[in-house]
Amino acid sequence: MSEQTPAEAGAAGAREDACRDYQSSLEDLTFNSKPHINMLTILAEENLPFAKEIVSLIEAQTAKAPSSEKLPVMYLMDSIVKNVGREYLTAFTKNLVATFICVFEKVDENTRKSLFKLRSTWDEIFPLKKLYALDVRVNSLDPAWPIKPLPPNVNTSSIHVNPKFLNKSPDEPSTPGTVVSSPSISTPPIVPDIQKNLTQEQLIRQQLLAKQKQLLELQQKKLELELEQAKAQLAVSLSVQQETANLGPGSVPSKLHVPQIPTMAVKTPHQVPVQPDKSRAGPSLQMQDLKGTNRDPRLNRMSQHSSHGKEQSHRKEFVMNTINQSDIKTSKNVPSEKLNSSKQEKSKSGERITKKELDQLDSKSKSKSKSPSPLKNKLSHTKDLKNQDSESMRLSDMSKRDPRLKKHLQDKAEGKDEDVKEKRKTAEKKEKDEHMKSSEHRVIGSRSKIINGIVQKQDMVTEELEKQGTKPGRSSTRKRSRSRSPKSRSPIIHSPKRRDRRSPKRRQRSMSPNLAPKAGKMRQSGLKQSHMEEFPPPSREERNIKRSAKQDVRDPRRLKKMDEDRPQETAGQHSMKSGGDPKENIENWQSSKSAKRWKSGWEENKSLQQGDEHSKPPHLRHRESWSSTKGILSPRAPKQQHRLSVDANLQIPKELTLASKRELLQKTSERLASGEITQDEFLVVVHQIRQLFQYQEGVREEQRSPFNDRFPLKRPRYEDSDKPFVDGPASRFAGLDTNQRLTALAEDRPLFDGPGRPSVTRDGPAKMIFEGPNKLSPRIDGPPTPGSLRFDGSPGQMGGGGPMRFEGPQGQLGGGCPLRFEGPPGPVGTPLRFEGPIGQGGGGGFRFEGSPSLRFEGSTGGLRFEGPGGQPVGGLRFEGHRGQPVGGLRFEGPHGQPVGSLRFDNPRGQPVGGLRFEGGHGPSGAAIRFDGPHGQPGGGGGIRFEGPLLQQGVGMRFEGPHGQSVAGLRFEGHNQLGGNLRFEGPHGQPGVGIRFEGPIVQQGGGMRFEGPVPGGGLRIEGPLGQGGPRFEGCHSLRFDGQPGQPSLLPRFDGLHGQPGPRFERTGQPGPQRFDGPPGQQVQPRFDGVPQRFDGPQHQQASRFDIPLGLQGTRFDNHPSQRIESFNHSGPYNDPPGNTFNVPSQGLQFQRHEQIFDTPQGPNFNGPHGPGNQNFPNPINRASGHYFDEKNLQSSQFGNFGNLPTPISVGNIQASQQVLTGVAQPVAFGQGQQFLPVHPQNPGAFIQNPSGGLPKAYPDNHLSQVDVNELFSKLLKTGILKLSQPDSATAQVTEAVAQPPPEEDEDQNEDQDVPDLTNFTIEELKQRYDSVINRLYTGIQCYSCGMRFTTSQTDVYADHLDWHYRQNRTEKDVSRKVTHRRWYYSLTDWIEFEEIADLEERAKSQFFEKVHEEVVLKTQEAAKEKEFQSVPAGPAGAVESCEICQEQFEQYWDEEEEEWHLKNAIRVDGKIYHPSCYEDYQNTSSFDCTPSPSKTPVENPLNIMLNIVKNELQEPCESPKVKEEQIDAPPACSEESVATPTEIKTESDTVESV
């Protein structure tokens, strides 16, 4: 066993990893990326052993992907099938039709063209029958889609005469006789009709007809011979047939039809009505004959390939009529066809039949001529063929459907054919009515006939369906087959059908009914088909879900995955679907009710409440059992039974959680081999390891599947529920166990299919699993909505995976399932299991079952997470009624209590159990009351979901017990309005945490685990210590509850009520004060700074400082104790008792927070606040509960430990654990007194070291003791390394230590990176978390992505410098055209690389040299550019200096990419040479150019001289320069002066004027 287990576990782990990896990669395939598709194809090939799971993933992705992203997934499927094949080909073939239709329906026309091209490449890959079925289905959606006929060797409808028809023929004779006479009469008219049709069709088929002429002539001769023989036979059999005819109408019961259908049907048609009708109207007969031919099953055979798909939609409507008519017509046609056939052949009526068909005709005609009766079947076939030929008109209709003819016919003949058809229809309808009257019985017979003859040949699928289906199913199949066979039967019908088809079909598409008729019927008929075909419908639903989900989803990522999964949308969809075609759904074998609504997973869950479970289709039921086998427990079957029973508070040290089972077993074997451990020890350790991992695996599975269950849904199933949670490192919900999930998926589909789907939840209805395996934080994965809350994490579990599992239907929300917090079992982390119905709306409260775990039994309607109630929020809402809106986590009370406090009844009251959300009082504070064992002194203090749930950290603390401090999440106030508890902290897990924000509704409403919890988990240290979760400071989770509370600590602020209280705790440095937000005091709010339970309390701020002792004590053991204590944990002990109303103190859940100001700590003096509880200092012992003495006292609180959280309090002392007090609120309920712990025990709690908790559990149960024992053994033998020193306390708090261990473990993991340098394929294929973690740890270079550990900061700095140099060089070099030496020396090559070594770097001057060169070049360029330039004006413009009038030189500026004027500047729109402008400025400063305003009369020269004099006086430039300027260009100056003078004059004139 021990050896197999590891192997099996390894295989399961490999499967999960493979599926998880593939799923994540597949989700990135959002567009047609060939490299990505190639990569996924290679990955699929590498994971060939998991082909089924991967195929399920791909099909699920196809279903849930947006319409724009479906085609790439189809290309991926195509790539895998063509390049890998093998198992993948088989797996994809199974659901090929459903998958293809699912995509085809949702995409636009362009994508459909791509799909057609894709389909055209599959002829050599997929089975032809499968492709034919696919074509038929698609054709029913899009009549333009060609149906590729099956080759003769594959096609069931071969030309041979069907022996069944031959058997029938003897009965048919009478009709033939009559028919014969009528045919002669009708033949002439038929010919003209045929000719007309031919003229229409000939345009399209002239070439074909020419080729067929010879064949037709030969066939004619054969037919003539056959006709003679047939006449002789008919004469012989006429008497017999007549007798049968007489009997036929009345005597042919539908029952007979089923067995004898062929014969009876044939007889019937020929018998009574046929003759009279024929005799009555030759022309009408002709029409009928033509029509009949189309309807004739035999004709269909020939044309079935082409027209199959198209006709199907129409068939339904016309099935009855067509069948009757076809039967009648066939009889008529037989004789008429014979005559016509010869004429037609002669006239070469362009039978659309190809040579192949012609041959068929020949054989048929032969059979016809041979004997109308026996051959009649044959004849009917031949007739059909002939009629097809003769009825080229009809054929044209058919041809439209027939891919071969379609091309030509569609454009040219369609309009004509339509008109003709219309006319024929009217005539046919009349005839039909007549025939119907006479052949109602026949109709049935004909149907069966068709089924036997045509259907068999035409559609293997139909046959299978018939075989599989019961009579009801059969009727539906018949209808289908009929509709198929009628393809060619009635052109008239066809055209109308076609039209109807489109609109109705579309309608159907949009509605589930559509599925119901086709997919539904098929499913009904056969489960196997249902699996295949049902898939598509689910996929559609999933898509719809996606859409709606997208809107709902809070987290984009989750939206993406979860929503699609989400059943919610299904609700809407259901309504649409159900509205669409209830009839069709009814056909489904499931109860019509369930059938009508194609329920999405969660809806189904709801229906479960109604008892739909009973109506679940077998496969659903099967699925449930299946899922349970996976380890998902159904809500009813406690997980403990499935797996080991586990302590509710079970906490698994992080080292164990992170350790690889394989590695542990390997190392253990090595120790055994080296003699370090004995064989007995080896066996014990291996057994314990196996149990531990089995438990963890089970929890994961449970989480997943339940989770999925809830939403039955497809999506979820397909998807991992994990995905969403990938967030927390650990969180990763169950890790998804994708495989599991996938498997489930497969099972699920049927659900989708079946109307029965109803019970969606496979598992129980949804179980909520708070799995979080490792993660601490619980994450509510749920599809969330539907309420399922999944605490992934053990929630509390910090370390441990202890997942909490809300097993309940959870998803159900309303579902009748109870929610089950499985609790301990939860892995180590003790998951909480709400067993109760949880979602149920009323039904069944939840039950926290875990043994250890608490079982909230309460009637309460279960808590509803989010539930339908849905408060979206997400919080978890124990809604109780479900209905309750309230939200907060409200354990609603049995139902309703609005407040709904919920009562967790602990079934056993056991202490543990204790938590009972009584709900009753709900009202009052609505607090939840943990009735719990109530008395238990610490009794678990209320529910504290500490244990399991919160489990300390995470847990929510129900105040009562949860009083625990922080620890649990306390749903304390949950009612409080504030109420929401927000586990901010840990849970947050780091961010992951669950945030029960939602339900919350309550304002605070849900609890939100906001904090990141550093450790990832929350670390409520205090409360549970839980392993850790320690509210350690920030980490800790902060129950923000109120949300307001900022402090990390968990502040149960919001919870109000609970957290209302803030244990500020004086205790430590600061008094603890429960500050109620509301002032009410009542609520204690652990505000305080929230002290962090960091230090031993100290931390004054630490808000629960002590309470949990947190700090101080870390409840190390809590973890271990954890839930257990839960029950009792001291303080909370009573929680149960506590009504949780408010915590005792007033913590009522009122929201008010009571402020326990009391510095003293724990005494919560605070007003008792409304809460009933008085908390009055509970601690004070005052009332409140008292900590179980035992606990209390024990200083250890150890027991408290049990309490876990409260215990944490270890430090309590001072703080006294306010928590206890506070939490205690419960107490009063219990009546237990709160013994205040008083600091006196402050530390006490702490103790309980890990061990304590366990209290004795059954042997089969995986208790904390077992885990601790195993952990200590592994540490002792060196198999596991402690991430941090394991002091006694540490051991006690293994779980507690977990948070820090997480960090240490990360380091250890890095150190434990396996040596893969031997490159062994098997090893490289394994997933090593340590390797992956290594890839994501350290400082990452923003430029190249390299990572540097914290010890490599210097190297990182040098690395950044190197990037800078490289970037600078590249930038500089890019400015100039550069060259390189012909030969690069080794040093040059090396210099291109980053060199960290200082000495080497000193030698690496390559870039510096290049830089210098670049600098020189740029400097030269700068010199060249020292001249100023301005953009040139428009091309062709002559631009010159305003001063010297010299034309500027133009050049092309590379940087600006435009022509510039060299050595120029532009000033006020004028361009100058810089030197000219400089001179101009200098002179202008002297007013060298008199301004017009001055109108000087003096000679400009004098003016200039004066200026120069002035300039000389002012130390300016030397007079020489000035003189030079003036003298050098005297003429110029004079001219310039003159000009100005003139200007002045003018100006003067102007002015004077």
UniProtKB/Swiss-Prot annotation:
The modification Asymmetric dimethylarginine is found at residues 805, 820, 833, 929, 944, 957, 982, 995, 1008, 1092, 1103. Residues 14-142 form the CID domain. Residues 167-186, 265-648, 707-733, 921-940, 1286-1313, 1516-1553 are annotated as: Disordered. The keyword Nucleus applies. The keyword Coiled coil applies. Residues 476-487, 495-509 have a biased composition (Basic residues). Residues 321-342 have a biased composition (Polar residues). Residues 174-186 have a biased composition (Low complexity). Its main location: nucleus. The modification Phosphoserine is found at residues 120, 169, 182, 490, 495, 510, 512, 645, 705, 777, 794, 851. GO terms for cellular component: mitochondrion; mRNA cleavage factor complex; nucleoplasm; nucleus. Residues 208-235 form a coiled coil. It is found in: Nucleus. Residues 308-318, 343-365, 381-422, 428-443, 530-568, 600-616, 716-725 have a biased composition (Basic and acidic residues). This is Pre-mRNA cleavage complex 2 protein Pcf11. The gene is Pcf11.
